[in-house]
């Protein structure tokens, strides 16, 4: 029973992103070859995140890992491991973009509906199916973002769309902080400073890219 309880979050995470990728494949008007390329890139990045979460879990519990490695592997990952995984994965993604292995704008345009649908499915599964975990506030926020995305994604320039979604998500999360004790993303409690940092870094990257294109 304990083993099943530990496998449930992994299964829900995998099922949610599988649903997000399937939704992207069905609804995208890209060619099959481009869809395949984007899906391979997204799966690679998601695998990186999962691997780095496990590495982060080991690093944040290094003393216990030295004493009893199996105990750490059975121990649930915490927010620090999640932060570390996002940081390292972001750096690797940035390097791949700089080296020309990934085209940033098309990749993000493909990844946004995947992450939104995956987030929606994750919260839905916990709230409706498992009836444990998940928060109605974040579920509503993701639902609104998903609706907003599909209303305006063909009407706005890509980078303006990225900024709008980032602003709405960040503002929505801070509103949730004011009415509930914590906010979770894929089961990990995220602190306000992480939201600010995530928002700031992404806004700077988007605006710098716009400025460079404008100068060129």
What are these regions (language model features)?
Residues 1-216:
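Hydrophobic, membrane-interfacing alpha helices
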């Amino acid at each position: 029973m304990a083993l099943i309880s530990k496998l449930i979050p992994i299964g829900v995470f995998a099922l949610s992103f599988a649903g997000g990728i399937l939704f992207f494949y069905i609804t995208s008007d890209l060619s099959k070859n481009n869809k395949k390329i984007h899906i391979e890139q997204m799966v690679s990045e998601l695998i990186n995140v999962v691997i780095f979460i496990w590495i982060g879990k080991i690093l944040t519990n290094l003393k216990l890992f030295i004493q009893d490695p199996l105990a750490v592997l059975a121990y649930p990952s915490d927010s620090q491991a999640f932060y570390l995984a996002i940081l390292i994965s972001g750096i690797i993604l940035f390097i791949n973009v700089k080296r020309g292995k990934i085209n940033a704008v098309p990749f993000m345009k493909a990844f946004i509906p995947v992450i939104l649908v995956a987030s929606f499915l994750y919260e839905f599964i916990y709230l409706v199916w498992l009836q444990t975990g998940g928060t109605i506030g974040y579920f509503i926020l993701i639902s609104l973002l998903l609706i907003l995305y599909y209303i305006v994604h063909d009407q706005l320039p890509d980078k303006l769309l990225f900024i709008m979604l980032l602003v709405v998500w960040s503002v929505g999360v801070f509103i949730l902080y004011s009415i509930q004790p914590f906010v979770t993303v894929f089961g990990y409690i995220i602190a306000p400073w992480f939201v600010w940092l995530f928002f700031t870094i992404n806004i700077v990257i988007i605006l710098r890219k716009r400025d460079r294109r404008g100068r060129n």
